[in-house]
Design a protein with these regions (language model features):
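Conserved SAM/SAH cofactor-binding pocket of Class I
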Residues: 111-212, 218, 260
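Conserved beta-strand segments of alpha/beta enzyme cores
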Residues: 99, 154, 179-181, 275-278
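Conserved RecA-like P-loop NTPase ATPase core
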Residues: 45, 172, 202, 217, ...
Length: 295
């Protein structure tokens, strides 16, 4: 990162643009991303450090220079240059129209998971007092989105990680969602003997040793939230096989899964005795969420 310009230069035309270009170029080169994408990220870091909006950075060059000279900006830019995901650097990520607190203790919410929420919402009427279980809640993005949009539902969210549960509870408070009970435990451990109208989960589904784990954002995310045994199906087997006794009659199980796993997951649901098994595809036409119903 080049040195900030002197005070006499702060108000010169194009000063803010020069700052943006210099840091954007460095970020694009380090992360092999497009210049427009790098520019957007630099603007986000500057607005956070300077506590100003993006328009002000361009309209008032001195504000851009001031933000750029802060220790907060230098630290966050260095973290991003190392490849750390923006969600962790900024401490937040938008999901389903809501901004969630994010920490390295939780998986970063992804657009594919919004498909899971959409399918769940279709099965929950706005006035329904249905019982819902979110297994492996992580940041709580699924449970909180459902709780926000279906306030009559009664939701239980579980996770093995105390740190993840703390983030999830914080997100529920942030969005004023009060119809979620959070419990610590592995999968159904914390809800022994209970039944639910809907069970949702975005479990780990990456095979241990997958080459993608040492690339991009995955390098920084918690392995326990990503990997599930040598074939990626360890968690899926555990959830699907144990789900039927925890479903009410007519209740549904919805699970997110990886690229190319759709048919195998559908077969798991059928083998567990679930019926009306369907898949929801992403924008590329790839099955990413599979659902089944207890007869």
């Amino acid at each position: 990162m080049s040195a900030a310009p002197g005070a006499d230069h702060l108000s010169a035309p194009g000063a803010a643009e020069q700052l943006l270009r210099a840091d954007s170029s460095a970020l694009a080169s380090a992360l092999h991303i497009s210049l427009p994408e790098a520019r957007r990220e630099v603007q986000m870091l500057l607005t956070r450090a300077g506590q100003v909006d993006a328009a002000s950075l361009l309209a008032y060059p001195e504000r851009a220079a001031q933000a750029r000279s802060t220790a907060a900006y230098a630290q966050t830019l260095a973290r991003r240059l190392s490849g750390e995901p923006m969600a962790y650097v900024l401490g937040e990520r938008e999901f389903f129209g809501l901004v969630f607190e994010i920490s390295p203790a939780v998986l970063i919410p992804r657009p594919e998971t919004e498909l899971l929420v959409e399918l769940a919402l279709e099965r929950l009427t706005a006035q329904s007092a249905a019982t819902v279980l979110d297994l492996g809640t992580g940041s709580g993005c699924i449970a909180v989105a459902l709780g926000k949009l279906r306030p009559a539902a009664r939701i239980v969210a579980t996770d093995l990680s105390p740190d993840a549960l703390e983030v999830a509870r914080s997100n529920a408070r942030r969005h004023g969602v009060t119809n979620i009970a959070f419990h610590a435990g592995s999968w159904f451990e914390a809800v022994a003997g209970e039944r639910f109208d809907l069970i949702v989960s975005n479990p780990p589904y990456v095979a241990r040793g997958d080459a993608h784990l040492v690339q991009g954002d995955l390098r920084f995310e918690p392995a326990v939230a990503l990997t599930a045994g040598p074939d990626g199906f360890e968690a899926m087997h555990a959830i699907v096989s144990a789900a039927p006794p925890h479903l009410t009659r007519g209740g549904s199980l919805l699970v997110e899964h990886g690229h190319g796993q759709g048919e195998a997951v559908a077969q798991l649901l059928r083998s567990a005795g679930l019926v009306d098994v369907i898949a929801r595809n992403d924008l590329a036409g790839i099955a990413r969420v599979t659902a089944g119903r207890r007869p």
